[in-house]
């Protein structure tokens, strides 16, 4: 079993006298910056000129610098911008300032594992990856609870890489819940697989296929939406709270029997074979090469798929039905970014 770390294993002294640069101020960036600041860590935020996030960070009382100046000022640099822009940002603005003894940190291992970022050998390279979106990382920190996280050491030039990563996790609030030891390869490959085969790709296609099956059979799209998409959250919440057994305990016996007898016909041997193929494509670097090339050539295919998905019947019906659901937090409907 991998090592697990808790509050007793972290020591903020390993960040004492050090400045941490949070590069980016999005979902994770704002949570990391605010939590570390509130834990007594000296924090600066690195944002490009003209960033819309600058005003938000400054309103929160944080010092904002350019990414280059933030990296120059800091002893610890946490990169929390999207995967596809990390390499250029690192190479152009951060790398020149990663002098011996500094720490380069990530919340996801994509660019290190697939060689898009190649740090010098005389710095520490670590990961602290909270297993929750940024708003939950911040919310639970303020409640004194914290979210679980993963920790990994890729380079240990100083001999204190793990200790500093655990100090960061402590300041972030994650050691209250517990942090599990991993490595960059395991985190990256398992994270991508989970996204592609289960959480995003798998779940989305399952929902779309179920919806379309009912609609093609003559059922009202509105009914199909409720049965195949809307109620999914109810089931996922039960699974997250207590596992599959708790979900099955909580639903009707009819639903549970259908689970046992029909579920394996949906996710069958052919599905499992495709899952293995998807994992193999991740492990070999094929997916990474495809995604990197997509970004280098203007994201034409990606943006076309995004627009097509936005205009699917299930999405059109969903936008209409959510107007009825006053119990949902009112959120602006998401459009389709063109770039």
Curated annotation (Swiss-Prot):
Keywords: Amino-acid biosynthesis, Branched-chain amino acid biosynthesis, Magnesium, Metal-binding, NADP, Oxidoreductase. Residues 1-182 form the KARI N-terminal Rossmann domain. It catalyses: (2R)-2,3-dihydroxy-3-methylbutanoate + NADP(+) = (2S)-2-acetolactate + NADPH + H(+); (2R,3R)-2,3-dihydroxy-3-methylpentanoate + NADP(+) = (S)-2-ethyl-2-hydroxy-3-oxobutanoate + NADPH + H(+). The active site is at residue 108. One of its GO terms (molecular function) is ketol-acid reductoisomerase activity. Pathway: Amino-acid biosynthesis; L-isoleucine biosynthesis; L-isoleucine from 2-oxobutanoate: step 2/4; Amino-acid biosynthesis; L-valine biosynthesis; L-valine from pyruvate: step 2/4. One of its GO terms (cellular component) is cytosol. Its EC number is 1.1.1.86. Binds 2 magnesium ions per subunit. This is Ketol-acid reductoisomerase (NADP(+)). It comes from Solibacter usitatus (strain Ellin6076).
């Amino acid at each position: 079993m991998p090592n697990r770390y808790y509050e007793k294993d972290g020591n903020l002294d390993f960040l004492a006298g050090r400045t941490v640069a949070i590069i980016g101020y999005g979902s994770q960036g704002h949570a990391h910056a605010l939590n570390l600041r509130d834990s007594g860590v000296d924090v600066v935020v690195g944002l490009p000129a003209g960033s819309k996030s600058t005003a938000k960070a400054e309103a929160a009382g944080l010092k904002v610098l350019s990414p280059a100046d933030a990296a120059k000022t800091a002893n610890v640099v946490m990169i929390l911008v999207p995967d596809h822009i990390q390499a250029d940002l690192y190479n152009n603005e951060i790398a020149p300032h990663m002098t011996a003894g500094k720490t380069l940190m990530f919340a996801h291992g994509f660019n290190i594992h697939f060689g898009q970022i190649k740090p010098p050998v005389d710095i520490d390279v670590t990961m602290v990856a909270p297993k929750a979106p940024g708003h939950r990382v911040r919310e639970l920190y303020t409640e004194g609870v914290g979210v679980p996280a993963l920790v990994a050491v890729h380079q240990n030039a100083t001999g204190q890489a793990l200790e500093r990563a655990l100090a960061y996790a402590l300041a972030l609030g994650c050691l209250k819940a517990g942090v599990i030891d991993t490595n960059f390869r395991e985190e990256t490959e398992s994270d991508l697989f989970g996204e592609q085969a289960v959480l995003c790709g798998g779940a989305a296609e399952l929902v779309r296929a179920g919806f379309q099956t009912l609609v093609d059979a003559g059922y009202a799209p509105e009914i199909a939406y409720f049965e195949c998409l809307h109620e999914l959250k109810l089931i996922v919440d039960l699974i997250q709270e207590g596992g599959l057994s708790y979900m099955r305990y909580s639903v009707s016996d009819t639903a549970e029997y259908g689970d046992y007898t029909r579920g394996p016909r949906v996710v069958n041997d052919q599905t499992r074979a495709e899952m293995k193929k998807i994992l193999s494509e991740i492990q070999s670097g094929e997916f990474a090469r495809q995604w990197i090339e997509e970004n280098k050539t203007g994201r034409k295919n990606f943006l076309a798929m995004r627009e097509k998905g936005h205009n699917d019947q299930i999405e059109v019906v969903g936008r209409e039905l959510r107007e009825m659901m006053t119990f949902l937090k009112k959120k602006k409907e998401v459009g389709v970014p063109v770039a």
